[in-house]
């Protein structure tokens, strides 16, 4: 018991000492360095393929979780941006859903078939938000978000820069009060994203097996016939 008390005292003393240390002024410098790295990496960003897991978590009023897994594709050619999410499993059950954003139009199909696809032409104004963490430069982020640097964390063995983002557009921040992303800044890609949607709901996106600047499948941005 004495040993346990001694450990607690040492730990508490360490916390007090840390609290008394002057705050590091490096956060702003660290953020500037991260954004500069993203600016550099974004210039060389063309394509990304990644396996993903999207978890929708609800804590209120009734706890619930939905998990979707599949493959995501991103492509940036000059000012043109395309992305697609092909869902293969929904709550561990086989699925064939697909979401495709191209030429400013978002299309979705619950069956993955072209004939069942629905189009949303107003999605183009949110293009810069869809680029979040995949080819977006530091300038792109600063233009749309108020950014706070939260340090680094290991994600799947990779040292990731953690950023907290609050949208400058009130229409966005009303629906998504806060976004936290973990970035591999050397490649301008996200390893993890957490969207706080308020009212007890959040979405967590995990990305693995990330391949950058390699040819994409010919059907990456197409539905099945």
Question: What residue ranges belong to the model's regions?
Answer:
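N-terminal mature ectodomain segment of secretory-pathway/periplasmic proteins
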Residues: 31-109
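Solvent-exposed coil/turn segments that connect beta secondary-structure elements
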Residues: 53-57, 77, 88-90, 102-106, ...
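Gly/Pro-enriched, hydrophobic low-complexity segments
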Residues: 130, 135, 148-225
């Amino acid at each position: 018991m004495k040993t346990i008390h001694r450990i607690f005292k040492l730990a508490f003393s360490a916390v007090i000492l840390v609290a008394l240390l002057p705050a590091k002024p490096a956060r702003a410098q660290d953020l500037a360095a991260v954004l500069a790295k993203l600016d550099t990496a974004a210039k060389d960003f063309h394509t990304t393929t990644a396996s993903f897991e999207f978890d929708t978590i609800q804590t209120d009023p009734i706890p619930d979780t939905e998990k979707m897994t599949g493959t995501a594709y991103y492509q940036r050619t000059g000012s043109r941006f395309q992305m697609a999410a092909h869902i293969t499993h929904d709550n561990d059950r086989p699925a064939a859903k697909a979401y495709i954003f191209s030429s400013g139009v978002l299309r979705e199909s619950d069956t993955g078939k072209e004939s069942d696809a629905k189009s949303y032409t107003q999605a183009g104004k949110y293009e810069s938000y869809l680029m979040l963490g995949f080819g977006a430069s530091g300038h792109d982020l600063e233009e749309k978000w108020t950014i706070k640097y939260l340090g680094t964390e290991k994600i799947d063995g990779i040292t990731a820069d953690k950023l907290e983002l609050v949208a400058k557009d009130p229409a966005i921040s009303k629906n998504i009060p806060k976004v936290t992303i973990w970035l591999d800044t050397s490649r301008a890609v996200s390893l993890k994203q957490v969207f706080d949607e308020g009212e007890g709901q959040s979405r967590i996106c995990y990305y693995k097996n990330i391949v950058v600047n390699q040819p994409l499948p010919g059907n990456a941005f197409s539905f099945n016939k």
